[in-house]
Design a protein with these regions (language model features):
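N-terminal flexible segment immediately upstream of the FAD-binding catalytic core
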Residues: 1-69, 86-116, 145, 265-276, ...
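Alpha-helix capping/hinge segments and adjacent helical runs
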Residues: 26-27, 417-429, 452-454, 458-467
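C-terminal substrate-recognition/cap domain of FAD-linked oxidoreductases
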Residues: 31-41, 221-225, 231-408, 415, ...
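A glycine- and small-aliphatic-rich helix-loop capping segment at beta-alpha/alpha-beta transitions
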Residues: 88-106, 134-138, 161-172, 219-225, ...
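FAD-binding subdomain of flavoenzyme oxidoreductases
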Residues: 107-261, 462, 478-483, 489-495
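Activity-critical C-terminal alpha-helical subdomain
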Residues: 186, 435-495
Length: 495
């Protein structure tokens, strides 16, 4: 485990950084006292915590550029932060760095109903975009479970999805243009509101880059018309494999639902006790399948989905009869994470993906892992695109439980890759999945990622120590395990 920086060295570095940033930020926009930085010591992955030297809260793009230029000159790491709802430790502060909060970049700059676009600052909440577009009969499609709080800047950084991403796509499919600043404080703008095929797709590179390439300050996003009607099917299954086969069956039938989600029995019990959505507590698994469009389209698709689900062994099928019932069906899925927080002191949410045909296999494997690691796990996930969200329940105050939880999570990710999947679908790598990158990618592939990182950030100051494994890490996997969010030898050369 790394030794903490001597207190006097850290204090001296903080004094230097605060003195350098004070001329470029108002006094109220620079926090450095211990009690002021506590709210920024972690993101949604609360098991790992670290206080930054200081927190910068710029209000203008000029201030963002000035903070970045100053930190670049001093060689100070910078970790950009949106709402801090991420689940992989992507916004975990650097103990000798500055956290750059975009919380004050919260203005919706324009909503254009004719072009069906919205131009927003990066600190705007995901749901606020849909609220602003609602008077025009439009909304923003990507809808992560944290949409009431998460920001568009964080969504861009993680390439977030949501329960409706199967039909409407991830963030990368719904963003037209991004604006931001490099680590040297230079403005960059990628993408266009018009068809843009010239050059390399640098916007595609920036979306999902986890704050490692640039700091996003603004985005132009697509808006889509609200459907005339949406209805949801809730299907119960007495066997996990039947439920998994039903997911594959729906897609194989040529149906692309607006949403196709799955919950296992432990998760169903947790959310039903929390929101009383009317779930079947005797079911081993529940599927939520949504159709939207014109009334005629919805009626036909609902009938087709119900037929497939019944053929695959559903023991009960309920169809929402009005908007209130549809929202009640979805309330359990949307509240899965807070419901889990009610039954466990802590949880760690994995985010691997799996081919749909292997859903039952991975869920049964996770059940065996529960016995191996002596920890409970509740499963909820985007079944339509095979994006798993197993929530491992544990107590972070118990070091042994945390260690077993980390091993459990790594086992899920490795098994997912072995079954043809990936280590993350939308939550990002952060620090949580750093080891597991070596399971999915070769040293040569990691070298290409590192080379791209250096092209944007030669000093490697933006969100360092995350996403890309350290040099030779793939060969050393198992000897350099991330524990409690800390990495031995954090300053080792990266590829």
């Amino acid at each position: 485990m790394p030794q903490a920086a001597p207190r006097e060295d850290r204090a001296a570095r903080r004094a230097e950084v605060v003195a350098a940033l004070s001329p470029v930020l108002p006094a109220h926009a620079l926090l450095w006292h211990s009690e002021e930085t506590v709210p920024y010591e972690c993101d949604g992955l609360t098991a790992y915590r670290e206080k930054p030297l200081a927190v910068a809260l710029p209000e203008t793009e000029e201030q963002v550029a000035a903070v970045l230029r100053t930190c670049h000159r001093l060689g100070v790491p910078v970790v950009a932060r949106g709402a801090g709802t991420g689940l992989s430790g992507g916004a975990l502060p650097h103990k000798l760095g500055v956290t750059l909060s975009l919380a004050k970049f919260n203005r919706i700059l324009s909503v254009d109903a004719l072009s069906r676009t919205a131009r927003v600052q990066s600190g705007v909440r995901n749901l606020a975009i849909s609220e602003a577009a609602a008077p025009h009969g439009l909304y923003y499609a990507p809808d992560p479970s944290s949409q009431i709080a998460c920001t568009i800047g964080g969504n861009v950084a993680e390439n977030s999805g949501g329960v409706h991403c199967l039909k409407y796509g991830l963030t990368v499919h719904n963003v037209l243009r991004v604006r931001g600043y490099t680590v040297e404080g230079e403005a960059v703008e990628f993408g266009s509101e018009a068809l843009d095929a010239a050059g390399l797709d640098l916007m595609g590179v920036l979306v999902g880059s986890e704050g490692m390439l640039a700091v996003i300050t603004e985005a132009t996003v697509k808006l889509v018309p609200k459907p005339q009607l949406a209805r949801c099917i809730m299907a119960s299954f007495d066997d996990m494999r039947k439920a998994g086969d039903a997911v594959a069956g729906v897609i194989a039938a040529g149906i692309i639902p607006a949403g196709l989600e799955m919950m296992d029995k432990p998760m169903t019990a947790a959310v039903e006790d929390f929101v009383h959505a009317g779930y079947d507590l005797s079911a081993e698994a529940i599927l939520l399948c949504e159709s939207d469009g014109t009334p005629e389209e919805v009626e036909e698709e609902i009938a087709r989905m119900a037929e497939v689900l019944g053929r695959c062994g559903a023991t009960a099928i309920a169809v929402s009869q009005d908007e209130a019932q549809r929202l009640r069906f979805w309330s359990g899925r949307k509240n899965a994470f807070p419901a889990s927080g009610r039954i466990s002191p802590d949880y760690m949410c994995m985010d691997s993906t799996i081919p749909r045909k292997r859903l039952a296999d991975i869920l049964l494997a996770i059940q065996e892992m529960e016995k191996k690691y002596q920890l409970r796990c509740a499963n909820v996930f985007h079944a339509g695109d095979g994006n798993l969200h197993p929530l491992i329940l544990f107590d972070a105050a118990d070091p042994d439980q945390l260690h077993r939880c980390e091993l459990f999570g790594a086992d899920i990710l490795e098994t997912s890759v072995r079954m043809g999947g990936t280590v993350t679908g939308e939550h990002g790598v952060g620090v949580e999945k750093l080891n597991s990158m070596c399971v999915q990618f070769s040293p040569e592939e990691c070298e290409q990622m590192a080379a791209l990182k250096r092209a944007f950030d030669a000093k490697e100051l933006l969100n360092p120590g995350k996403v890309i494994p350290t040099k030779h890490r793939c060969a050393e996997y198992g000897k350099m395990h991330v524990a409690r969010g800390l990495l031995p030898f954090p300053d080792i050369e990266r590829f």
